[in-house]
Amino acid sequence: METFCFRVSFWVALLGCVISDNPESHSTNLSTHVDDFTTFRGTEFSLVVTTHRPTNLALPSNGSMHNYCPQQTKITSAFKYINTVISCTIFIVGMVGNATLLRIIYQNKCMRNGPNALIASLALGDLIYVVIDLPINVFKLLAGRWPFENHDFGVFLCKLFPFLQKSSVGITVLNLCALSVDRYRAVASWSRVQGIGIPLVTAIEIVSIWILSFILAIPEAIGFVMVPFEYKGEEHKTCMLNATSKFMEFYQDVKDWWLFGFYFCMPLVCTAIFYTLMTCEMLNRRNGSLRIALSEHLKQRREVAKTVFCLVVIFALCWFPLHLSRILKKTVYDEMDKNRCELLSFLLLMDYIGINLATMNSCINPIALYFVSKKFKNCFQSCLCCCCYQSKSLMTSVPMNGTSIQWKNHEQNNHNTERSSHKDSIN
């Protein structure tokens, strides 16, 4: 895990060096209403960086142009290629990792329980983002324009792209909250032994999570349109949030705070509350004979709780830099300040690093689980090698989070062993 974190830090630092090697070349003129010129998985660039030509554009809602920064904005070829390599790596790792995660859970009936279903839902949301949104992001960076900008399909993509971004991050956030609640329920109801299968309550939770995520993303599909504008005598079109009603104007004004509060703070607060309650519950169980009876049972569930906590921490680390840059832009930036260009250069650097970290979150969960659970690591390797179920004498069912542990030895079919394995199943 330490090696993995070091490699991620190295690439992020390298990306930062490429961006910051010439700060003047990356300064841009930013207005409050250009927030959504470029979109990245639920949180928008406020910086005009989609064009490969030197750009010095500010496009307010009233169509007038602000005073430009002295320096022009441009994206170096080195950054383009490094960012493209990072995006392609995330695409491959995210698609293989999340698809493998879904395959393991689908093919192994013993893993079809509540928490595994929630993490499968999490993986499916990440997979949708990786397959649909990442290719569009790479195209925008390399081509310097919106795909099919002069066709109806381009308008459809302009609606679909931010909608899926918000839906994906909503699915991630709500699933993490549901996992935290589930871990508390599992510890609080220590005597409940769950067999194979997904509980009805969990199935309802998953359906509700997806429906709510889609509903919360509807304003994105409504507000984003292809906006034509003229720059240096040339006609351009870009996909951006264009408020045309009082509701959309209100949504645009509070959007950054809404994203920070609901899509970032809420899962952290939810995890803190339920993990505190879970800790108190575990401490209350550590008494006399009850402690002995529950020792192994709670040990398994404690390990699951650590895994879920790890996923929440990774989510926080991936998304915090981007939310921080958005809040700084909202609170510190003044578009009428003549000295704003230095701040814009700093915000641009934070946005680039934050966006790449946030995008990594869509592929990092399977990797994290790979390092957290040795049993999942073995099953992951076996699944990729297409030999997960070829053992002759032993059928091992191992979950992706190292929780649903069931060993059935065909030569030693012991009733007590099977009963114990069901008790160790994640609830």
From Swiss-Prot:
List modified residues, type Phosphoserine.
425
> Which residue spans traverse the membrane?
81-102, 113-132, 160-181, 206-229, 257-278, 307-328, 348-372
Localisation per UniProt entry = Cell membrane
The region annotated as signal peptide is 1-20
One GO cellular-component annotation of the UniProt record comes to: plasma membrane
Q: What is its main location?
A: membrane
Membrane-protein topology: Multi-pass membrane protein
What SUPFAM superfamilies does the annotation carry? Answer: Family A G protein-coupled receptor-like
> Which CDD domains would you find in this protein's record?
7tmA_ET-AR
Q: Which residues lie on this side of the membrane: Cytoplasmic?
A: 103-112, 182-205, 279-306, 373-427
Under InterPro entries, the record lists: Endthln_rcpt, ETA_rcpt, GPCR_endothelin_rcpt, GPCR_Rhodpsn, GPCR_Rhodpsn_7TM
Which GO terms of type biological process are on file?
developmental pigmentation; endothelin receptor signaling pathway; enteric nervous system development; regulation of blood pressure; vasoconstriction
A Pfam family it matches? 7tm_1
Q: List the disulfide bonds.
A: 158-239
* A GO MF term: endothelin receptor activity
Mind listing the UniProt keywords for this protein, alphabetically? Cell membrane, Disulfide bond, G-protein coupled receptor, Glycoprotein, Membrane, Phosphoprotein, Receptor, Signal, Transducer, Transmembrane, Transmembrane helix
UniProt superkingdom: Eukaryota
Where in the sequence does glycosylation occur per the annotation?
29, 62
Tell me which parts of the chain lie in the Extracellular compartment: 21-80, 133-159, 230-256, 329-347
Q: What does this protein do?
A: Receptor for endothelin-1. Mediates its action by association with G proteins that activate a phosphatidylinositol-calcium second messenger system. The rank order of binding affinities for ET-A is: ET1 > ET2 >> ET3.
Give the family this protein belongs to, as stated in its UniProt record. Answer: Belongs to the G-protein coupled receptor 1 family. Endothelin receptor subfamily. EDNRA sub-subfamily.
Q: Tell me the subunit arrangement.
A: Interacts with HDAC7 and KAT5.
Q: What is this protein called?
A: Endothelin-1 receptor
Whose protein is this, by species?
Answer: Sus scrofa (Pig)
The beginning of the lineage is: Eukaryota, Metazoa, Chordata, Craniata, Vertebrata
